[in-house]
Amino acid sequence: MTVLNARERKDQKAHQTKELRNQGHVPGVLYGKKVKSTPVSVEAVAFLKTFRDVGQNGLFDLQLENGGKHHVMVQEVQIDPLNNQYMHVDFFEVDMNEERDVNVPVHLEGDAPGAKEGGIVNHLLYEITVHCLPADIPESITVDISNLNIGDSLSVSDIRANVPVTIVNEDDETVVTVTPPTVTEDPDATEEDNTTAESVEATGERNDDNLDRPGRVE
């Protein structure tokens, strides 16, 4: 199992945390049902490599300087939106014998025939919640859309049998649809139709005026 080294943080003051980030480390916290909440820090480069290698719900060992090793997964990551710097990481110690709920990303696979006919593929459910042991958590759930025509859709009930773990979501939740292409009106044609209608209306008004005008008596 992948190992990420960490050290305990004794000083949690704001200026110390900022200095820690400036030195290339990410502050975080280790917690779980059987471990006391412990402030920690990890090297930013090492964390990024580990996170990319194991994936969103991947398991790895967090090795503390004092010799303690914990089976963990990343529960939450806080990122600065301005510079994409990792601000804080939550490491959750998992019990390998206890099932838990986890959100797993949904990926679409294949080319929908309906899309080739001009239809629009709408990916509606980007994550699915599964309930399973930590070792059985899938990295992602792949949904095949190669048989979807215009007007077709796939819901959770359609993919449940193909997923080897328990899906928590309701059966009627829609994962993906293929809808007919949107027809946009030609603004020039619309303007021309409006102009024609106005001309006809104006002509009608003139004719009405002529009918109302009294004729000349000889």
UniProtKB/Swiss-Prot annotation:
A molecular function (GO) held by this record is: 5S rRNA binding
Cite the CDD domains for this sequence. Ribosomal_L25_TL5_CTC (cd00495)
Q: Which UniProt keywords apply?
A: Ribonucleoprotein, Ribosomal protein, RNA-binding, rRNA-binding
GO CC, one annotated term: cytosolic large ribosomal subunit
Q: Where is the composition biased (Acidic residues)?
A: 185-195
- Start and end residues of each stretch annotated as Disordered: 178-218
Its GO biological process terms? translation
Which residue intervals are annotated with compositional bias (Basic and acidic residues) in the record?
203-218
The lineage's top-level taxon is Bacteria
Q: Which InterPro entries match?
A: Rbsml_bL25/Gln-tRNA_synth_N (IPR020056), Ribosomal_bL25/Gln-tRNA_synth (IPR011035), Ribosomal_bL25_b-dom (IPR020057), Ribosomal_bL25_C (IPR037121), Ribosomal_bL25_long (IPR001021), Ribosomal_L25_dom (IPR029751), Ribosomal_uL5_bac-type (IPR020930)
Oligomer status and interactors: Part of the 50S ribosomal subunit; part of the 5S rRNA/L5/L18/L25 subcomplex. Contacts the 5S rRNA. Binds to the 5S rRNA independently of L5 and L18.
Its function, per the record, reads: This is one of the proteins that binds to the 5S RNA in the ribosome where it forms part of the central protuberance.
Return the HAMAP family for the record. Ribosomal_bL25_CTC
> Could you say which protein family the record assigns here?
Belongs to the bacterial ribosomal protein bL25 family. CTC subfamily.
Question: This protein is called what?
Answer: Large ribosomal subunit protein bL25
What gene codes for this chain?
rplY
